[in-house]
Amino acid sequence: MIKNREIEVAPPRRTIQFGGYTFVEPDLNFKAPIFSCCGSIRDPSCEEREEEYIDNGHDEEPPVEVNRIQESTSFDEPVSSPPRYRPSENPGPSSSSYEPGHYSFNEYQQFPSRPQKRLVDPPIVDLDEEPPIVDLDDSFDNFHVGSTSEEVVSGDIAPEEEEEEGHDSFDDFESVPAQPPSKNTLASLQKSDSEIALNQQRHDMHGRFRGFLQDDSEEFSDEVGLLGADMNKELYDTLKSKFGFNQFRHRQKQCILSTLMGHDTFVLMPTGAGKSLCYQLPAVILPGVTVVVSPLRSLIEDQKMKMKELGIGCEALTADLGAPAQEKIYAELGSGNPSIKLLYVTPEKISASGRLNSVFFDLHRRGLLARFVIDEAHCVSQWGHDFRPDYTKLSSLREKYANPPVPIIALTATATPKIVTDARDHLKMQNSKLFISSFVRDNLKYDLIPKAARSLINVVEKMKQLYPGKSGIVYCLSRKECETVQMMLTKAGLSAEVYHAGLNDNLRVSVQRSWIANKFDVICATIAFGMGIDKPDVRFVIHYSLPKSIEGYYQETGRAGRDGMPSYCLMLYSYHDSIRLRRMIEEGNTTTGVRSMHLNNVLQVVAYCENVSVCRRKMLVEHFGEVYDEQSCRNSKTPCDICERQRKNAEAIRLFDVSTDALSILKCLPRMQKATLKYISELYRGALIKKSQEQAMRLGHTKLPFYSKGQGMSEQDALRFVRKLVIEGYIHERLYSVPNQAAAVFAYAELTEAGRDLANGKKTAKVYLHIVTCERKRKNAGLIELSNMNIVSEAQALKERHMVKHGDVFTRCLQDLTHLITAVAESSGLSGPYSIVSREGIEQIAALLPRTNSDLLRIDSMTQIKVTKYGRLIMELLATYWKQVDEREEEEMRNQLDKLKSGEIVMGGFATLQSDPGFPSVPYMKPLGGGGGCRGRGKKRAFSGFSSGRATKKPRATAPSARGKTSGRGGAKPATSLKRNMYPATSM
């Protein structure tokens, strides 16, 4: 037992670099803490303190207290936990009897006694066979899919190695070593160039934000000078006495100083970084009432309870509050010196309640309206993943309370530069001070595996081993899916409950509080759950379905590991989930601009999932404008699955130039009406399924120029290639529905305007595809075919793209860079600039404008020695061009915002499907969104559309639903028997 009641972390000591090693200057006054055996009896003086802490990689102010001793810091070691109530009949091992051991993702075999075929690609219906039927109601909550086929097919994402039977891909993900390797081995003394580049003194932009967002923290670094000694002392005294903290963390101090000085303040911090303190502490110190606008009643209730526990006057005016309670709050607000320091309200309450606005006017007149706080400020922007119309009405707060102006604080954890700009414009706080914390969550491991029949069960078994008795979240797309997953988890031996909008308010609150109190393990929820939840020990977050946006995914995964301990974030990826999301978007009544934005968000998530080469942490972080060196992830204890594979084998992935084949497909696509992506990929490989072979030959599709060009690709590679054309914007999958069949949806490939321009020669472009070339089961013939394709370097591929996008910047930068390197060569007595960097290398630098050491190291002829020697000079020169590019992209971003507001952006739309010779005429087929069908209880008839030209089949009868007629689109009743998945897009 540690005798010290409070242990303070010593400031970091000075380090000395020598060669490839780092030495720490010893502390001559070091005193070892006193330890003694306590006979397993807990000393009451060593009570744990609940304090959230997140390691965000670049924080300037580490916490000054060690609040608790954690059980594990590695994915290899199971985390022990206190006993908890477990309603499940098959509870996991308790912490009392559990002996920590070493668990590796490679060592643990799932279900060793039951070998099974692994579904890399979940079987779904393809229009080459028969159209799918999907049943859903207005809210999409009663969606259900029929039994899956037993056919084993390949997925889209090529894993590092194909798994053998009985071995799930999840077992191949390596966990963090429990003990570091011996430092006496030669291997431990050798470092790669990229590792050295990461650890050397940095002159790049790693950990900094691009020019879109300018952090104002430096302006508020001197608290004594800004506040005065007395006010500053009161600030820290209140921090300790009311909130129990000794120091601020992240950007809290600067945000609070800005608020205390009366500035409008915009706070952009990740989940769990302590945003709430930025307005709660000023509310306690300064007189008056702080009005907090929050989107969820559950979130409001949680905050109110916390404040009252801390002895801070706090009330909430919500729709479910009784009249007597409301009268009491209004009376207190009207008193001469209200005891209420924080008043929580919803945006709907502000827009609907005249009495509340009258109270605000009265407080403002008396000088007691301290500030407005807009929590979850991303809800203001239509670009935000959780846009709420009532939030846009909050702009009136600036107009109504302008003399004197009432300060506004806006806070969010998930806002891209575009959302920040839009939100500031909406709230009329363009001149607000901006404070940004790093988006890097070093303790989270990001992972992705194909969504297959037993994927979730295998993952759950692994979580039970790694985190026995610990909490987790499984996010689902619909209410029905939540209930299905909850039953699966219960059967697997985990205690689980559901949380979605279909539950009444009391039940939702009860479920949430029970989960926070550790009365059950896993909560199966829609995205309605989690906002503002203060539970630091969530050990895993699993996305059973595709999230709606990158911002939403980051926010939802951010609910894991808020205590700073290693935690696991996994996505089960199926491409057809994107079609489900698109249907929900395209059925909605939105402007073309908003619809375009939401569709683009889904496409960004698909690109994240289809990616096999770029660090997932880098993709997430840079989505928010922060520059990140992926080598940091690769060297961490929690590398993402991409970096883990790269760490094992840096040559596992090769980049191929597939431009010629892509152009051939685009030219042929207009001749192939009703073609699905899967059918196109089969033609490209020359590997049509048996049922469609005859029709393809009859229609002449086997004579198309691109037929059988991709023989060297696996099925998943070919699918990724075709989907790449969708992601790049050359192909668009248009969704169609059938009158009288509200459940049926079809996705057919069509050329976009950019695709037509490329096919017609009006523009030129390159298309590249990353392929995993080290798979155990890849046939030799396939490797030979791949070897005949053009392999290019990452820098070469990016060079051509950037040269086109910023041609004038490239020209000027190339000239300046050549002059710089020539001068360096002359001063070093070298023959010329190309003795330092090759001509190709100089062009690549000018085109790519690398912002990190690792990016610079990828340049042709660049080595670690050169990065160390010349990196600072190169980065200093590039800084000017970084700024120019950022300014252009910021202007483009503002233009997009303007178009969004006017609805000028049009993506998709609903065109009439033209019949193709050789295909049966279907006069009653309508595009999705073109109107409903007949209402009533008549029998439904499934449309037998297809992509390969087979004859139509007889209509398939569906059993009547026990639920009766729905109130959904077209009044169609959901089918109860489905033998295939729902959409004609192949899933993972």
Curated annotation (Swiss-Prot):
Zn(2+) binds at residues 615, 633, 640, 643. Residues 46-119, 148-185, 930-988 are annotated as: Disordered. Residues 807-888 form the HRDC domain. Its main location: nucleus. The keyword Metal-binding applies. CDD domains: DEXHc_RecQ2_BLM, SF2_C_RecQ. A motif (Nuclear localization signal) lies at residues 939-955. GO terms for cellular component: chromosome; cytoplasm; nucleus. Sequence repeats lie at residues 121-129, 130-138. PROSITE patterns: DEAH_ATP_HELICASE, HELICASE_ATP_BIND_1, HELICASE_CTER, HRDC. GO terms for molecular function: 3'-5' DNA helicase activity; ATP binding; ATP hydrolysis activity; ATP-dependent activity, acting on DNA; DNA binding; enzyme binding; four-way junction helicase activity; metal ion binding. Pfam families: DEAD, Helicase_C, HRDC, RecQ_Zn_bind, RQC. A motif (DEAH box) lies at residues 375-378. It catalyses: Couples ATP hydrolysis with the unwinding of duplex DNA by translocating in the 3'-5' direction; ATP + H2O = ADP + phosphate + H(+). GO terms for biological process: chromosome organization; chromosome segregation; determination of adult lifespan; DNA damage checkpoint signaling; DNA replication; double-strand break repair via homologous recombination; meiotic cell cycle; meiotic chromosome separation. Its cofactor is Zn(2+). Belongs to the helicase family. RecQ subfamily. Monomer. Homodimer (via N-terminus). Homotetramer (via N-terminus); dimer of dimers. Homohexamer (via N-terminus). Self-association negatively regulates DNA unwinding amplitude and rate. Oligomer forms dissociate into monomer in presence of ATP. Component of the BTR double Holliday Junction dissolution complex composed of at least him-6, top-3, rmh-1 and rmif-2, which is involved in double strand break repair in the germline. May interact with rmh-1; the interaction is required for mutual stability and localization at nuclear foci. This is RecQ-like DNA helicase blm-1. It comes from Caenorhabditis elegans.
